[in-house]
Amino acid sequence: MKSLIIAEKPSVGRDIANTLNINEKRNGYFENNKYIVTWALGHLVTNATPEQYDASYKEWKLNDLPIIPNKMKTIVISKTRKQFSTVQSLINNNKVKDIIIATDAGREGELVARLILDKAHNKKPTKRLWISSVTNKAIKEGFNKLQDGRKFNNLYHAALARSEADWIVGINATRALTTKYDAQLSLGRVQTPTIQLVQMRQNEINHFKPQTYYTMKLNAAGLTFHCTKPQSHPDKTVLESIKKAIDGQSGHIASISKTHKKAYPQQLYNLTDLQQDAYKRFHLGPKETLNTLQTLYERHKLVTYPRTDSNYLTDDMVDTLKDRLKAIMATSLKDMAKAQMSQTFSSKQRFVNNNKVSDHHAIIPTEVRPDINQLSQRESKIYMMIAQRYLENLMPPHEYEAIAIELKVGQHTFTFKDKVTTKLGFKAIYENKESINTQIDQLQKGTKLNVTKILIEEHETTAPPYFNEGSLLKAMESPQKFFDLSDKKHDKTLKDTGGIGTVATRADIIEKLFNMNAIEARDGKIKVTSKGKQILELAPQKLTSPLLTAEWEEKLLLIEQGKYNASQFISEMKAFTNQVVNEIKESEQNYKHDNLTTTECPTCGKFMIKVKTKNGQMLVCQDPQCKTKKNVQRKTNARCPNCHKKMTLFGRGKDAVYRCVCGHTETQAQMDKRHKNKKSDKVNKKDLKKYMNNDEGIENNPFQDALKGLKF
């Protein structure tokens, strides 16, 4: 008898097979005399569509809503049916005694496996592999510590409740809004509050009125001293009177203080922090960073599990710290890493805290030595960010003297502040020498100083910045800082539940909002589009607040802990859905396509709408039941021969033209000719045709499946 191992992806299945010497390759699985290892392809099973409950639901009608099944159904995803059949036959194979769930260690990973087992009518006992990296060592240790699958039943119940609730609320709210206003509109408990978050920041900027204020400083002994009372003032005459009173006077040092202090590095990375830093440093979008992390985790085995919200490690990992240091010695950090090998590490390290790790610890390097030359430029950048942050946290703290000197001039006090490094510590990664300020060493209390210059400076308060992809991600994590919530309990709920969405879903949500044209980015500034503003006006108010998702996450966490009933949660979601649908039905508002063009749809003759996508623009028919789309422009990977920037594609077919911001223009024929000897860089006719014929759709269009066959 054998154990069947179900991994979430083929790459992880192969890793497990290699580690456990499961070498006999079959069609969709590996096998030896002890194990069979197979895999999903992400989800193999999903929730049924409304029309799979009742064929009449294929036509979207407002009067049919709400659609609330008594019992939710699941279906096998058509494009992965073959692999499901393989997994199903293995589950029910007589030579299989038990199932080892080896999908991602978390709520969604549990759901992937349990839906498959449920659909295959599994009756066999289950065990759970729970690991945070897929190195040989981690897999072996995980198999030595397999847990009873029943221990994770509540995790599955929470995952299933989340999935069903999202279906019930999302399907009904989207269908209600779309049919009510005859437009492709979408609502969701995560995406709608995110639009609101961007709009609130936009309103704050629009309503901001700059305020002028003044500060005063003076120079003495080559140092700059700042006025302390007042530090700043809106009335310039107040500071002018002080200047007049002290003009021509010398000062004396009233006090000198030197305080020894320590500074510690930033915390180990969780996913959100890493995505935000990658955007700041390399202008990588959250989705790009996550995809790169997945490759580093799955293919290269260089980093631990990426979808984590923790900045800490557990104490059982302390013994592995030096092995990970050895791994990063294969990089440019070699000398710094080697210097830390003589240290003794313990569970008292500031980044070790079992209570602050739930499913997964912080993102850190694995024990696998990287070959940087085998990584892409993006992979190398992300890996080095993780390796450097890890090394910083293992190095001693930065030590310095905080110096404060008070200079008395007449009746007024001015202060000079500085920091003098005594030990570089972790900052040795960035700096190569310790700072010395000899001027300060020559000063003592009572020393008289001549004032050489007195300056009054004018300043102006600035509006908060627009969100970019990195800062929006961080705001979604802490929405209580932006929403005005009168009840402090709600603040705590949002903080405790991790804000809007999860670390695993936020990047997808932002991407989806771009693709559905609810938000747009101009010069890195994210703004709400006219469509997004109207969605906020038309949506039931509770769907625009982050409180709904916070309340959900709070109850889902209780379900995980066995303290709340999943069926009760679903009943509440059904009641809420009824309220949402009724509110939309009774609304007397209107939706206006203000991005309507005078271009007629070649299929139905109605005017088309200009839609901005993340990589360009396209025309989409305003009629939801007509799926006609036409590309206007699209940023490509083709590089300008003059300035080497990416060129934008206009038109299609023989009329296609590539233009660069520097003014260079090429036809498709010229582009083909220029690249005929550079096949790897070529934007050829075949690729162009494939792009043009791919339904001319918006990238990752969230409505493509939901709206096909839509009739009113």
Curated annotation (Swiss-Prot):
Cited Pfam families: Topoisom_bac, Toprim
Region (Interaction with DNA): 186-191
Domain annotation Toprim: ranges: 2-135
The UniProt record lists the keyword Aminoacyl-tRNA synthetase: no
Cofactor dependence: Mg(2+)
EC category: isomerase
Alphabetized CDD domains for the sequence: TOP1Ac, TOPRIM_TopoIA_TopoIII
Catalytic activity field: ATP-independent breakage of single-stranded DNA, followed by passage and rejoining
Biological processes per GO annotation: DNA recombination; DNA repair; DNA topological change
Coiled coil: none
Any one Gene Ontology molecular-function term assigned to this protein's record: DNA binding
EC number annotated for this UniProt entry: 5.6.2.1
A single Gene Ontology CC term: cytoplasmic replication fork
Record has Secreted as a keyword: no
Catalytic residues, chain numbering: Y305 (o-(5'-phospho-dna)-tyrosine intermediate)
Location of the Topo IA-type catalytic domain: 152-581
Record: residues binding Mg(2+): E8, D104
Residues annotated as site: Interaction with DNA: W60, W167, R175, R307
Keywords: DNA-binding, Isomerase, Magnesium, Metal-binding, Topoisomerase
Family indicated by similarity: Belongs to the type IA topoisomerase family.
PANTHER family per the UniProt record, alphabetical: DNA TOPOISOMERASE 3-ALPHA (PTHR11390:SF21), PROKARYOTIC DNA TOPOISOMERASE (PTHR11390)
Protein name per Swiss-Prot or TrEMBL: DNA topoisomerase 3
Protein species of origin: Staphylococcus saprophyticus subsp. saprophyticus (strain ATCC 15305 / DSM 20229 / NCIMB 8711 / NCTC 7292 / S-41)
